[in-house]
Amino acid sequence: QVFYLKLLVHFIGDMHQPMHAGRKADKGGNTIQVRWFNSGTNLHSVWDSKMLNHFDMSYTELAENLDVLSKKQVKFLQEGDIITWINETSGMAKKVYNSVEVGEKLGYNYMYNYFDVAELQLQKGGVRLAKVLNQLFG
């Protein structure tokens, strides 16, 4: 049962990373090469880890720096179901794809434009995971 719980936690989190809802043809951005602060990488990696790791914060520090959501905001973010949420993330993926060119150098401007989006996706994943866990165990 622990394995299945870990799988659920991982799945709900991953479904909020835009590149996990990306195009099959480019393996969710894995084949789209970009420069991240002069270092070669791919678009998937930027969204999977590079942006969030840029500030070198622990998960606890990152969580402490997120805005606290009101009950109304949590309720709004928990609306819908898994299909609704993945469709929402897919829409976000389209915006991410449109935000870069192959080989583009990404840096502070990209962070300025998209770090808040990445943080919001993390928050969505967390509050939606809470909804699913409450439905299962509540």
Model-inferred region functions:
Residues 1-11, 15-31, 35-45, 54, ...:
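Soluble secreted/lumenal catalytic domains
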Residues 33-124:
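An amphipathic alpha-helical core segment
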